[in-house]
């Protein structure tokens, strides 16, 4: 769908919420985008009598499904993690009004002086998430899914980025390495896995640091996965 049509739909939806949240519609401005078809906007308003900003997620329903984000936001909030709260939703249109965790990512804030405290907070949040884990809630990080993601290394890094074609021995060696990785991951303790727990998705916040974003693809899988992403 034409982005201008989406923006018109978004503005119409916000207009219906403007009274409830005291939204200043003319303040709407792009906030960020990600590797999907989702876009994010920031809009000024009032919550509980205090002036603050909100985030609007624009997720075209032809390509995106907001339901995992909504469900996992609630799940992670129950684990006392600092995630965007879903304040308003229109799943059919792919529009969400979210609480705003600010502009400062870990990536932009990291330096030798700030790193110890930021990573201490990130470790604590990760432990908190893992302690809240229960089987049967999130999709399993299955062998098939892990295998598909390992094969991205061959397809995108070796073949497309480095333009390398492996010979039969190299291919066999890499396949053996992948099997060792798979066996190790599947034998580990299984917990909630954010799956993208790194400095671009962690926000520096004054309270309950860090704010955690981009969790909609979370699964139930190996306990070391998010640590590897973080470090």
Task: Give names to the regions the model predicted.
Residues 1-23:
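Juxta-kinase regulatory segment immediately upstream of eukaryotic protein kinase catalytic domains
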Residues 191-192, 204-231:
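Active-site Asp-x-Gly
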Residues 41-147, 152, 162, 186-187:
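ATP-binding pocket architecture of kinase catalytic cores
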Residues 196:
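Conserved catalytic-loop position in the HRD/HxD motif
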Residues 33, 91-93, 218:
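Short glycine-enriched loops at secondary-structure junctions
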Residues 200-201:
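Conserved protein-kinase catalytic-loop position immediately C-terminal to the HRD catalytic Asp
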Residues 10, 16-19, 134-139, 145, ...:
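An alpha-helical support segment within catalytic cores of ATP-dependent transferases
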Residues 23-41:
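ATP-binding glycine-rich phosphate-binding loop
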